[in-house]
Amino acid sequence: MIVAANLKCNHTRASFLNFTKKLDNFLSGEASNFKKNEILIFPPNTAFCDQISNFTQGAQNFFPCENGSFTGEIGADMLNEFGIKSVLIGHSERRVIFSESDRMVLEKFKFAKKRGWRIIFCVGESDIVRMNGNYREVLSDQLSEIDLDYENLIIAYEPIWAIGTGKSAKNEQIEEVLEFLAEKTEAPLLYGGSVNLKNISQISKLPHCSGVLIGSASWEAENFINLLKELQ
């Protein structure tokens, strides 16, 4: 079971260090059954920590470069300093808020694949697309250019209308989309979108579900630990 936490624009270096200590202690004790590569935490770039033992740290965003004249961006050299080899690509907040194009998403994918990084590739439809019923076409388009056979690929289904709204997709909706995605790739499939303490257990048991990508419910260490307890 893969459990990923997107901390988004939350946590300072000090607060994330405290987060990591609490989580490491939990994972080394009563939750030692979780493997390090099953728990992925994506802090903001300014909070990267080099004192992590029992989980994997990843990057929410990066620019497809080693280094260079790219003001405000972070490249592979910076990620390498912290041993980061897991990245989020294609998140709807990057696409919508920051106007990240399909071309840039593809460039990031190619860059990460070339380096053997573990990629959580996010796909999802808007509420309008969902109501119109053509979400399968939209999801197919989002996946059309990437290598679905890449060995370090994870696909996260995050319907845009469920992200940060407190309104998770219904189990039958999640199950249908995951089945559709499973026909396209053998990559592990995650669900993300208002995952919380009340629904995480049921979601994790759905067919084709290999785990979850959690947003706000994971931002505090105690809350994230309680979510992990639901999966034990």
Swiss-Prot record:
Query: Where's it found, cell-wise?
Result: Cytoplasm
CDD domains xref list: TIM (cd00311)
Record-annotated active site: H91, E158
Per the record, its GO cellular-component terms are: cytosol
Q: Which GO terms describe its molecular function?
A: triose-phosphate isomerase activity
Q: Which UniProt keywords apply?
A: Cytoplasm, Gluconeogenesis, Glycolysis, Isomerase
Q: Where does substrate bind?
A: N6, L7, K8, G164, S194
- What is this protein's function per UniProt? Involved in the gluconeogenesis. Catalyzes stereospecifically the conversion of dihydroxyacetone phosphate (DHAP) to D-glyceraldehyde-3-phosphate (G3P).
Q: How does it assemble?
A: Homodimer.
Q: What is this protein called?
A: Triosephosphate isomerase
Q: Which organism is it from?
A: Campylobacter hominis (strain ATCC BAA-381 / DSM 21671 / CCUG 45161 / LMG 19568 / NCTC 13146 / CH001A)
Q: Which gene encodes it?
A: tpiA
